[in-house]
Amino acid sequence: MNSIPVLTVKDVAMLDGVLGDFLKKAEADLTVVIDRGGNVISQFGDMSVMDITIFAALAAGSFAATRELARRIGEIEFNALYHQGNGSHMFMNSVDDDTIMITVFGPRTTVGLVRFYSAAAAQNVSNLLKTLQRGGHGLEFTAADISAAPIFADPAPTAAAVTPAK
C-alpha cells in the first residue's frame, strides 16, 4: 500500500473541486474517497445522515469481501459495486490499487448516470493523488505510522544510559 498523501488546505480544495463537479453532474448526494483500509481521504456532499468514519470502514470491508469473492471465480477484483435500497443507493468504484470512491444517491438520479460520471471522477482523483504523493510537501504518512504503540511512552534506555561512568 502506498503512503497516504499529506493534504494541505489547497490539496483538499482541489479534491473538493473534483468531487463537487462529479456530484453536480451525477446528481448524487455524497461522495467519499477512502483508502483500502477504510481511512477517509476526502468527502463532499451531505454528510448529515451518517457517521462518515464508520461508513468508510464498513465500505472498505465490503469492497475487500467482494474482492475475495471475485478471486473465487477467477477475477482479480470487481472494480465497482452497487447496493440498491428502497430510497438510497450506494455505488463504490476503484480509483486505483489503494483507493475507493463511494457515492450515495437517491431517486433523483440513476445508477447509470452515477457510474458514467464516476469513471472520469475516479481518474481525476487518481491523477491528483499521484501528483500529491510525488510532491509530498516534504511530509509522508504511511500505514506503519498507524500503530497501537503508546505515543508518550518513555523510550527504552540506551546502552550509554545503562553503563555506569568510571
Name what the model sees in each region.
Residues M1-L30, G37-K166:
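Acidic, low-complexity cytosolic segments
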